[in-house]
Amino acid sequence: MTAFLWAQDRDGLIGKDGHLPWHLPDDLHYFRAQTVGKIMVVGRRTYESFPKRPLPERTNVVLTHQEDYQAQGAVVVHDVAAVFAYAKQHPDQELVIAGGAQIFTAFKDDVDTLLVTRLAGSFEGDTKMIPLNWDDFTKVSSRTVEDTNPALTHTYEVWQKKA
């Protein structure tokens, strides 16, 4: 399985200055639940946005073009083929692609599961989720969580690629 995991506002926004444009603890718990025990692939900038690195209890894989980049406690790779080679060596762990936008683009043709959190509000930011062909996927679950701040009301959706 290769899954995309991300949160977006109602306009598809996913980032602001290298960080999330909102603070949503419930979604951070969801992110953790979806990545613990798995291979989590992120780009260098996304990795560096984490307050504590590497994220515990999961394999942190950093995909970067910087040949000399080092990330203590993480696996650093320089192309998509290296990610799949690493995953093949660890068949017991699912592959979760967690951004940013360039990393999603690199894996766009390989994804079979979409784990998206949709926030009801509209936020300020500078990075949107890449376009996906939603017709290639079927929604298999959806759960809405109300928030006292209507903009933070959010829905967790799981989509599977059609056979």
UniProtKB/Swiss-Prot annotation:
Residues bound to methotrexate: 27, 32, 58
Pfam families noted in UniProt: DHFR_1
GO biological process: one example: one-carbon metabolic process
Pathway assigned in UniProt: Cofactor biosynthesis; tetrahydrofolate biosynthesis; 5,6,7,8-tetrahydrofolate from 7,8-dihydrofolate: step 1/1
Keywords from the named record: Antibiotic resistance, Methotrexate resistance, NADP, One-carbon metabolism, Oxidoreductase
Residues that hold NADP(+) according to the record: 6-7, 14-19, 43-46, 63-66, 80, 98-103
Site feature May be important for enzyme function, where: 22
Start and end residues of each DHFR domain: 2-161
GO cellular component terms listed in the entry, alphabetical order: cytosol
Reactions performed catalytically: (6S)-5,6,7,8-tetrahydrofolate + NADP(+) = 7,8-dihydrofolate + NADPH + H(+)
CDD domains assigned: DHFR
Keyword NADP: yes
Keyword NADP found: yes
Class of enzymatic activity (EC top level): oxidoreductase
Domain of life where this protein originates: Bacteria
EC number: 1.5.1.3
Entries under InterPro entries matching the protein: DHFR, DHFR-like_dom_sf, DHFR_CS, DHFR_dom
Binding site for substrate: 5-7, 27, 32, 58, 117
MF terms (GO), sorted A to Z: dihydrofolate reductase activity; NADP binding
Biological role: Key enzyme in folate metabolism. Catalyzes an essential reaction for de novo glycine and purine synthesis, and for DNA precursor synthesis.
Family in the record: Belongs to the dihydrofolate reductase family.
Complex and partners: Monomer.
Miscellaneous comment as given in the Swiss-Prot or TrEMBL entry: This bacterial strain is resistant to the folic acid analog methotrexate (amethopterin).
Protein name: Dihydrofolate reductase
Gene: folA
